[in-house]
Curated annotation (Swiss-Prot):
NCBIfam families associated with the record: PRK10696.1
InterPro entries: Rossmann-like_a/b/a_fold, TilS/TtcA_N, tRNA_Cyd_32_2_STrfase, tRNA_thiolation_TtcA_Ctu1
CC terms in the record's Gene Ontology section: cytoplasm
Alphabetical list of Pfam families matching this protein: ATP_bind_3 (PF01171)
UniProt name for this protein: tRNA-cytidine(32) 2-sulfurtransferase
GO biological process: tRNA thio-modification
Additional remark text: The thiolation reaction likely consists of two steps: a first activation step by ATP to form an adenylated intermediate of the target base of tRNA, and a second nucleophilic substitution step of the sulfur (S) atom supplied by the hydrosulfide attached to the Fe-S cluster.
Keywords noted in UniProt: 4Fe-4S, ATP-binding, Cytoplasm, Iron, Iron-sulfur, Magnesium, Metal-binding, Nucleotide-binding, RNA-binding, Transferase, tRNA processing, tRNA-binding
Gene encoding the protein: ttcA
UniProt-listed CDD domains: TtcA-like
C-alpha cells in the first residue's frame, strides 16, 4: 500500500523500526480501510468528529485515520474531540498538549457530566451506561456545531463481540454495535472504523507508540459485571481454541435470516415449495410418486 520509507504523519513519528511493528501497523491500517470500504463510510469532502478519550483504542483510531488522510486515501477532514466530563483527577492538559504537538486539529470541551451521574446513580452501581449516554449527546451537539457529518468512535472487534454476547445472554436479542449507523435524529452518521481490529492489536500499537494513555476508571467505577463475565468467557474460548474470536466475528457478517426464528426478518408464512405441475408428477413411475 505504501513504502515504509515514505514520509509519515507526526502521529506515527518515532514508531519502532522493527519488522513486528511494521506488520502490526500495516495490519491495522488494512483492517481500517477494509471496514471503511465495506460499510461505505466515506463521503468525499465530509468532515468527521473523531472522538478521543485518551485510551489505547482512540489513539490507535486517530493515528490510523490521519495516516490514511496523509497518504490521500481518506478524502475527509478530521477534527479530534475530547470531552472532559469533570472526572476527579482527569489530566486536563495531556490531550490538548499532545494534539497541538502533533499538529492535529482538535476541540476540547468541558462538560461536568460526572456530577450528574454521581447524583443520579446509587452508590455501588456502575456509572458507565448513563455516563455514555450523556457523553454521546454532547458529542452529537459538538458535531453539529462543527459542521461534521459523522461521529467516529473507537470501538474495536472485541467490543462488538462482547456487546453481541451481552445482548444474547442478558437482552434476549441478536444485536451489537454496528460499524455504521444513523443517530436517532437522523442527521449524523456514527462510524466505527476499528470494527475489524483486535483489541490486542490496539493495545500493542498504542503501547509501542508510547502515547500518553489516560485511564478510563478515574471516576472509581469499573466495567459492569456482565461485560466482565463476557470478557472472561471469550478469553477462555480463545485460550482453548486460538482464533475463536475471529471465527465468531465472521459469523456476525454471515447471518442467514431463513435459518433463524425471527418472522420479522424472514417471511416464513409466505414460504412455499417450488411450483411443480401435478401433471408432471403423473408422468413419473409410481415408485417415484411414493405410490408403490
Amino acid at each position: 500500500m505504501f513504502d515504509d520509507q515514505d514520509e509519515i504523519h507526526p502521529l506515527l513519528a518515532g514508531a519502532p523500526q522493527t519488522t513486528e511493528f511494521r506488520k502490526l501497523r500495516k495490519r491495522i491500517v488494512r483492517e481500517v480501510r477494509e471496514a471503511i470500504e465495506t460499510y461505505g463510510m466515506v463521503e468525499r469532502g465530509a468532515r468527521w468528529l473523531v472522538c478521543l478519550s485518551g485510551g489505547k483504542d482512540s489513539y490507535t483510531l486517530l493515528a490510523v485515520l490521519h495516516e490514511l488522510k496523509w497518504r490521500g486515501l481518506l478524502p475527509v477532514d478530521l477534527l479530534a474531540c475530547n470531552l472532559d466530563q469533570g472526572q476527579p483527577g482527569f489530566p486536563a492538559t495531556v490531550l490538548p498538549e499532545f494534539l497541538s504537538r502533533m499538529g492535529v486539529p482538535h476541540r476540547i470541551e468541558y462538560q461536568d457530566t460526572y456530577s450528574i451521574v454521581m447524583d443520579k446513580i446509587p452508590q455501588g452501581r456502575t456509572y458507565c451506561a448513563l455516563c455514555s449516554r450523556l457523553r454521546r449527546g454532547n458529542l452529537y451537539r459538538i458535531a453539529r456545531e462543527e459542521g461534521c457529518s459523522a461521529v467516529v468512535l473507537g470501538h474495536h472487534r472485541d467490543d462488538i463481540l462482547e456487546t453481541f454476547f451481552m445482548n444474547l445472554f442478558h437482552g434476549g436479542r441478536l444485536a451489537t454495535m454496528p460499524p455504521k449507523l444513523v443517530n436517532e435524529d437522523g442527521d449524523l452518521f456514527v462510524y466505527r472504523p476499528l470494527a475489524f481490529v483486535a483489541e490486542a492489536d490496539c493495545e500493542k500499537f498504542a503501547r509501542d507508540m508510547a502515547y500518553p494513555i489516560i485511564p478510563c476508571d478515574l471516576c472509581g467505577s469499573q466495567e459492569g459485571l456482565q461485560r466482565q463475565q463476557v470478557k472472561q468467557i471469550l478469553d477462555g474460548w480463545e485460550a482453548r481454541s486460538p482464533g475463536r474470536r475471529q471465527v465468531m466475528f465472521r459469523a456476525l457478517m454471515n447471518a442467514r435470516p431463513s435459518h433463524l426464528l425471527d418472522p420479522g426478518l424472514f417471511d416464513f408464512l409466505g414460504l412455499a415449495t417450488a411450483p411443480r405441475a401435478a401433471e408432471e408428477r403423473q408422468d413419473e413411475p409410481p415408485h417415484l410418486r411414493g405410490e408403490a
